[in-house]
Amino acid sequence: MSHILRAAVLAAMLLPLPSMADQAGKSPNAVRYHGGDEIILQGFHWNVVREAPNDWYNILRQQAATIAADGFSAIWMPVPWRDFSSWSDGSKSGGGEGYFWHDFNKNGRYGSDAQLRQAASALGGAGVKVLYDVVPNHMNRGYPDKEINLPAGQGFWRNDCADPGNYPNDCDDGDRFIGGDADLNTGHPQVYGMFRDEFTNLRSQYGAGGFRFDFVRGYAPERVNSWMTDSADNSFCVGELWKGPSEYPNWDWRNTASWQQIIKDWSDRAKCPVFDFALKERMQNGSIADWKHGLNGNPDPRWREVAVTFVDNHDTGYSPGQNGGQHHWALQDGLIRQAYAYILTSPGTPVVYWSHMYDWGYGDFIRQLIQVRRAAGVRADSAISFHSGYSGLVATVSGSQQTLVVALNSDLGNPGQVASGSFSEAVNASNGQVRVWRSGTGSGGGEPGALVSVSFRCDNGATQMGDSVYAVGNVSQLGNWSPAAALRLTDTSGYPTWKGSIALPAGQNEEWKCLIRNEANATQVRQWQGGANNSLTPSEGATTVGRL
């Protein structure tokens, strides 16, 4: 054992251990949210297979360092399974996006198996967790020469049993997809095991750090929990439950429930976060003030921590190219900046749509918001309070390092009207319709005790898949020497150098070190920086460097 590793083991033994939930990368309620500090990029749009046929994995590989430098800790990848389907209704056509796959072969319209592995390796090496979109509910059972053979009449398919309509039957415990003839019986032991083994394969061979479960209205949430337990228990997961109260039958309790209650119930049973369609519905149908009614704005942190917030995605929003993509529920252009300002400064796990980030000119604005979120230490379960008496939406968000005051389409004059202390303006966009202030960095922000932004750098941080470089030190903002509370550095554009900005009290002598640990299990400390501690006296814009 090297002296560095020996020191790391000894240090870990002497430090307080995190809870078991923390060790597993789960919330206190055992939900797989990976610590609640993820910022996810949706790594595709609907027309990718037509705009960049057979080349998308190469593009993701080439963009890996940029994605990491932009502040994303995870990427939602397209469905990796082969889909050569096609459809046309006269005015529109499509197919091949992965949502009507026919087998688990990875040589599809996004690129080859080898290109997928290279992209996953590049992203993982840059510190970006790979989350695969998976579609267990249905498949293209009629495609010739597929590598999966599930004969009819043996209980593998929904329509092997009598179908009462769009309700569960003896061969399917969820809603049917379109007519239901393509729906798999995920409760059948062979079908269940087929997916369990494939999820394990994606984790072990293709760098999966988690999964996005498509169309979860089609199968029991408990099945998602079982798959995760059996194949990737410490990984991230999120479910797409796009089903409003009115879509449930009159005898179902969800028919008179709220969107929040419906999606939270799914999360409780699946033990996975869930897309915040409660917030999306308010973005589409309510005023900006109504955005507080999303799952991420719930007064209970156990509700906020499971919310995966988004503005638009490949289904709801527009895409470059043919027919503008799906755009089933697209947010109006005039609210896109306000929506990103909200999800990137508030609780929940935010997802940024690829086209908003890299195609349509919102990238610089989104980068600025990501930096504000990271510096403030806003997490999925951060506290949020809303303030009435003003137009638009006004909220105060308490991060681990700074407090943010957010005003959207509001007549709020200054943050002092709703929060005490010193604040400085962090964001002012859309002619004042988007304003964000942060605590501790106003004029005089260099005075002792005020929070200032310090750039941290750790050199020589070579890591394995699933590990990252962290800064840990002798103040609460640096975790009080606890690896479980250390601050992850997210800029890996110069890998193996890792960088990040951390807000620290000005004028106080502080000490810190670099360390490498597993992202999901804080007890798995791989390496502590050797030698003496790094020392600094924080001031606004200062830089401090450590070396592993």
Curated annotation (Swiss-Prot):
Q: Which InterPro entries match?
A: Alpha_amylase (IPR006046), AMT4_domain_C (IPR015165), Carb-bd-like_fold (IPR013784), CBM20 (IPR002044), Glyco_hydro_13_cat_dom (IPR006047), Glyco_hydro_b (IPR013780), Glycoside_hydrolase_SF (IPR017853), Ig-like_fold (IPR013783)
Spell out the residue ranges making up region: Disordered.
529-548
Q: Kindly indicate whether the keyword Signal belongs to this entry.
A: yes
UniProt xrefs under Pfam families: AMT4_dom_C (PF09081), CBM_20 (PF00686)
**In the UniProt entry, which residues are flagged as the active site?**
D214 (nucleophile), E240 (proton donor)
Q: What class of enzyme is it?
A: hydrolase
Residues the UniProt record annotates as site (Transition state stabilizer) = D315
The record's disulfide annotation reads: C161-C171, C237-C272
Predominant location category: secreted
The cofactors named for this UniProt entry are: Ca(2+)
Every CBM20 domain range = 446-548
Which pathway does the database say it acts in?
Glycan degradation; starch degradation
Transcription regulation recorded as keyword: no
Residues where substrate binds: Y99, F100, H138, F177, I178, G179, G180, D181, R212, R217, G218, H314, Q326
Recorded catalytic activity of this chain's protein: Hydrolysis of (1->4)-alpha-D-glucosidic linkages in amylaceous polysaccharides, to remove successive maltotetraose residues from the non-reducing chain ends
A biological process from GO: starch catabolic process
Listed Polar residues bias regions: 529-542
PROSITE patterns assigned to the protein according to its UniProt record, in alphabetical order: CBM20
Cofactor note text: Binds 2 calcium ions per subunit.
EC number(s) per UniProt?
Answer: 3.2.1.60
Renumbered to this chain, the signal peptide range is: 1-21
Complex formation: Monomer.
By sequence similarity, the record places it as follows: Belongs to the glycosyl hydrolase 13 family.
Indicate what this protein is called per its UniProt record: Glucan 1,4-alpha-maltotetraohydrolase
Organism in which the protein naturally occurs: Stutzerimonas stutzeri
